[in-house]
Amino acid sequence: MTRRFALLLALAACSKTVQPAADQPAQTGIQLGDLDRKAAPCDDFYEFSNGTWRAQNPIPASMDRWSRRWQSGEQNKEKLKIILDELSAKTDWPAGSIEKQVGDFNAACMDEAKADALGLAPLKPMLAELDAVRTPADVQVAIRKLTDLNIAAPFGFGPTSDPHEPSRTIAALGAGGLGLPDRDYYLKPEPRFVEAREKYHAHLKTMFALAGLTDSPEQVFAFEKRLAEASLDNVALRNPKNLDHPMPFDELVKLTPHFDWVAFYKAGKVEKADLNVAEPGFMKAFDRELQETSPAEWRGYLKWKVLAASAPWLSKPFADESFNFNQKFLGGVGEKKPRGVRCAELTDQLLGEALGKKYVERYFPPAAKARVQELVKNELSAMKEIIEHLDWMTPETKKKAVHKVETFNPKVGYPDKWRDYSGVHVKRDALLANIAEGQKWEVAFEHGTMGKPTNRDFWGMTPPTSNAYYNPLLNEIVFPAGILIPPAFDVNASDAVNYGAIGVVIGHEISHGFDDQGAQFDADGRLQNWWTEQDLKQFQDRTSCVANQYDGYFIKPGVHHNGRLVLGESIGDLAGARVAYLAFQKALAAHPFKPADGFTPEQEFFVAWGQFRGDQIREETQLLMIQGDPHPVARFRVIGPLSNLTEFQKAWSCPAQSAMVRPNRCDVW
């Protein structure tokens, strides 16, 4: 698994959401049958809003978690599968058309029998090239080839908006190259990490044996451990300043003198210009490995990176072993998803805007886009009002914060300009070659943006994606069509339900512009302080309250959230709920209504939020989240923010001593 370093994309993404199957009616309101009436809303609102649903909906064997959102997300992939099956069934699409590209890619992916018959054969030419590595110069050529395949071995290389001049795109280097989820899995002594290392050792040995590799799995693990020792931990990675190391090309050469960056840049057709090195310490360690690690050890490591990346799409023994370690052991998943669903995910990954264009034509009506744009507009207005009424911020900082809200760039549904995939050459009978072709094209596309003005039309997610994000470098909030579906959003739902579900997501993403990361970027996306000293101290004190709150949330005895790791998402949840609620109150004043479900409109808003966030998560997945995911687990994404909101207490008439009323509330925005 490669590590995401923040300045490559700087995406603050919310958790996944979902869409109903074609043969199910749209759910336009809260689900009364999912409530647990035995649970008092003022004692445990998560159980009250989700208890019956959770009791009646076990996690499917192929999933690491389950919820209404995830259920609809999987049904959404079934919609992609319908499109793909239709396109791949026809073989005479015009040459170069997106229908032919997408259809042929899916046809190659779906031919599991051919993959099983071929075994390792599709990968043998690449493994043979790597097996020929004998000198330090050969190692560097191999690293360049793997970079072209979008494999971080061991560093990641990609574009980013310059954090000091976001109007231009520069190159960025970051740490990568690990096979375990993060550095702590290699270094920490706790039993779960020790077990993971033992399982990973066994996994390496099994995969090497399947591929007939004679390289040393022990040397590969030792190599990765040294990389881990040089990497920042997950909390440090959340601070943009820890990743901000701009330098000219010549300084990079001095930092890592044993790597031929001139040849690397020339091979990637990248200009030798200024760049950002996210983790200079890691790059120094990389340079030491070039000096001290033998070509034979490098050879084994590089072959492993290619094998690990390809295994899910090779024959059954490789695919099963990859699944058994990465999904079954690490995530607790019992079985693979159906091949068609996995192929839909792969096509979306590599040809996402081509497939996405077909998706929005069929499933995302103009009325839905217009309604979401209206919600976004209303919530940006609400955020401005909240800032203007803060009692702890000086007028000087308020003015800059309001200006930042006014310069937000919302994107809804799909891009105005679609990407042209005509340069991607797809064969109907060569899956691994198609994957390599898609990755090479994506890398070349990214390299082509470096040294040029930032493309503000670019989307960091594909239209069918069930997610959303805020990019601080561009001060933009992005909501793909894939998230704008029930239960997150329904054009026919009440304001209470829409503001309580997608509205809180919108508020969450807006609030990322003012969380512990986003607050370090100004309205133009520059990484620079825009706060007075007094206001910054107030902000940090208030965010520390949130971090301390989440430090106290345990998923099992001895295992709790790291409040600093989840701080940005927790601020987003708290402020996002407040922003959405204020916008909802204004909508309610303009268009009063009385719900037919026995709740007040305000209560319906909070039930919609609780049900949107409710889910089931396997313990193994929760442990992964606790370790490296900046999002809290679902239960704490409900009770955490709501227990701080006076609006919630008032809506449910909660006594001051209730469990859902914190005695010392955290209040940031």
Regions found by a protein language model. Give the residues of each.
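Sec-dependent signal peptide recognition
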Residues: 2-8
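C-terminal motif of bacterial Sec signal peptides marking the signal peptidase cleavage site
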Residues: 11-13
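N-terminal low-complexity, Pro/Thr/Ser-rich intrinsically disordered segments
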Residues: 19-31, 35
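Active-site-surrounding "flap" and adjacent substrate/cofactor-binding loops of secreted or lumenal enzymes
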Residues: 23-26, 39-44, 48-116
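Hydrophobic/aromatic-rich, well-ordered segments within soluble, folded domains that form packed cores
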Residues: 34-55, 186, 190-209, 567, ...
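Noncatalytic, helix-rich "gating/capping" subdomain that lines the substrate-entry/channel surface
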Residues: 87-378
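Intrinsically disordered, low-complexity linker/terminal regions across diverse proteins
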Residues: 220, 226, 255-258, 276, ...
